């Protein structure tokens, strides 16, 4: 994909392809000089993301509204952007106890592209339409297109297809005037400036994307009730570390002892929500479970808070 576009009769280079003056002599720098420079440049990332908080919050509101109607959150990207989407999607089930079908990561080139470059995969809009057709996207879904450049054909094809299906479309790109930013209903465009290594958007642009994805998924899941206070009340307890974390969460939320937390977890069949209600209200596991069902799974309501 060409990195030049015309403006006032002249060709203008995309922001993500411009050279960073501070790193012009990068190949002459010592190790300490390189990492110092990278650290200074990285400090620009959270500031750029902060400028986009209103757009990020609007995106969360839209995603939450649709997920409450049975929709899904779907990330689409290629290369680094696609991998970041797959990573964030894969972390949601163990963190929030949700089905893997609710947050999906779609990457150009398929599973192999997560660990290996797949030549030409990002250059086809048709491939994106094919991949998304298999997901049966509808009006209650939200699709987040991830592309630092904002010009990746695969992502543009995904956005166009999702729009036709009535889904909410969100762009995350480092180029504000890019085709992707213009195509999506909500554009999140952190301007992190040129990279230390020219065009290597796995650096600042990738870091900004990761921060945005953290916010989108975490804020969405919290709004949907998958946290109590700031505790992961629905985490999946698949190993010893997570089982111990569940115990600590219960103790932290209730002020109870280790033995009391362990007993409540056993009696609730390791259901953190039920165990929390038991200890907070001093009731049996069956009564706590019924209270949770009566509150339609709303933990605060079941606790009477």
Q: Which ranges hold each PLM region?
A:
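Glycine-rich phosphate-binding loops that contact phosphosugars or nucleotide phosphates
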Residues: 74-211, 220-224
């Amino acid at each position: 994909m060409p990195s030049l576009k015309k403006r006032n009769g002249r060709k203008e280079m995309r922001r993500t392809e411009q050279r960073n003056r501070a790193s012009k002599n990068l190949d002459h720098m010592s190790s300490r000089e390189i990492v110092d420079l990278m650290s200074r440049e990285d400090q620009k990332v959270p500031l750029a993301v902060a400028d986009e908080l209103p757009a990020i919050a609007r995106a969360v509101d839209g995603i939450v509204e649709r997920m409450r109607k049975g929709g899904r959150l779907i990330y689409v990207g290629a290369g680094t952007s696609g991998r970041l989407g797959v990573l964030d999607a894969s972390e949601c089930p163990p963190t929030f106890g949700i089905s893997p079908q609710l947050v999906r990561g779609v990457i150009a080139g398929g599973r192999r592209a997560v660990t290996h470059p797949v030549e030409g995969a990002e250059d086809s809009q048709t491939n994106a339409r094919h991949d998304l057709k298999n997901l049966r996207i509808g009006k209650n879904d939200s699709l987040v297109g991830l592309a630092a450049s904002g010009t990746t054909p695969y992502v543009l094809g995904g956005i166009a297809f999702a729009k036709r299906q009535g889904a909410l479309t969100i762009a995350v790109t480092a180029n504000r005037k890019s085709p992707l930013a213009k195509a999506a209903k909500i554009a999140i465009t952190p301007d992190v400036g040129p990279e230390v290594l020219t065009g290597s958007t796995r650096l600042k642009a990738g870091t900004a994307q990761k921060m945005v994805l953290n916010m989108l998924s975490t804020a969405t899941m919290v709004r949907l009730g998958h946290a109590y206070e700031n505790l992961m009340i629905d985490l999946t307890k698949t190993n010893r570390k997570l089982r111990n974390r569940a115990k600590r969460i219960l103790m932290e939320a209730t002020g109870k002892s280790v033995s009391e937390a362990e007993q409540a977890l056993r009696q609730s069949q390791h259901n953190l929500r039920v165990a929390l209600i038991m200890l907070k209200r001093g009731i049996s596991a069956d009564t706590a479970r019924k209270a949770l069902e009566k509150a339609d799974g709303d933990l605060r309501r079941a606790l009477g808070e």
